[in-house]
Amino acid sequence: NPNFLETFAGIASSFKIPDKILEFELTESIFFDNQQIKTVRETIQEMHRMGFLCSLDDFGSGFSSLGLLKEFDVDTLKLDRSFFLNMSGQKAKDVISCLIDLSRHLKVKTVAEGIESMEQVELLGSMGCDMIQGYVFSAPIPVNEFEKRYLRDQP
């Protein structure tokens, strides 16, 4: 839908949602041909102009290219869970640490996806990872369960 940004901008305006609160996630698999790259670059620019954030989701899950990071002005790099399946070796830790450092140099926030243990949380924290998500905190839950658990004291 070519008007999807206008639709979301209208919703954000009607609910008085401040800029830089809503974030769109793009998966790296959409960046496979040159015409798409041009369209995606322009769409990301339009997202930012309208006050939205943009993240590159599942980075490293397929045929990711570091070139994507120079092509697109994303706000967040979401590192795919495959990076964290076996973090016991030094080489694995070095790759993760380098990606986090690269993101920091590019002024892009990092999210580690699919984290399952407090040991991973502590290691990623020591590496400077900005955000962590995964089963270590909660399995996916239905909306009504979320509301019961987290919004019970709301008016």
Show the residue positions of the predicted features.
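EAL-family c-di-GMP phosphodiesterase catalytic domain
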Residues: 2, 14, 21-35, 52-155
